[in-house]
Amino acid sequence: MKPLVTLFLAVVLTMPLMAQHEEDFAAHFVELNGSEADLECTTVSPRMMERILMLPNDTTESDTLRPLLEQVKSVRIVNCTTTPEAAVLLYEKAEVLAQYHPLGYQRYAHDADCTIYTRRRGEFIVELVLIMQTEGTFCLVDLTGNMTGEILRIGVVKGER
């Protein structure tokens, strides 16, 4: 019995460490498709997010946005300017990856050229992925953190997708 308890404790104690090393959607997408397409990936790290939050509030809109930004740990933006056909292909590859990814992304919203996926852990959204394509441009925005559903609602109120 003692070895089982020890094994259980070892597994439970290492789970947070494994969760910290999960690869986010954008990094996984670039790893799979970066050699085929000229993908440009920009990352806003947790440290940079902290610095952004230290900036003074100078607009009333920041009163609404600041609590949402506090929930975001990092941001990755993947861009590719290419032919319209290649942009559609990248969009379709991102859709397939999200639908069949083992971490379990759920589609939140979708239209012809834009889809939003979320990944939850408990009551929090730990990852929000926006996939878009327009004539010759593919864009993927990946937010990670411990976000509430308010981050999705604010986009709807502001008239965004």
What are the residue ranges of the model-derived segments?
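A recognition module on extended beta-rich or small alphabeta surfaces enriched in W/G with H and D/E
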Residues: G149, R153-R161
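Mid-length scaffold segments of soluble, non-membrane domains
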Residues: L68-A112
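Short, solvent-exposed polar/charged micro-motifs at secondary-structure junctions
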Residues: R51-M54, D113-T118
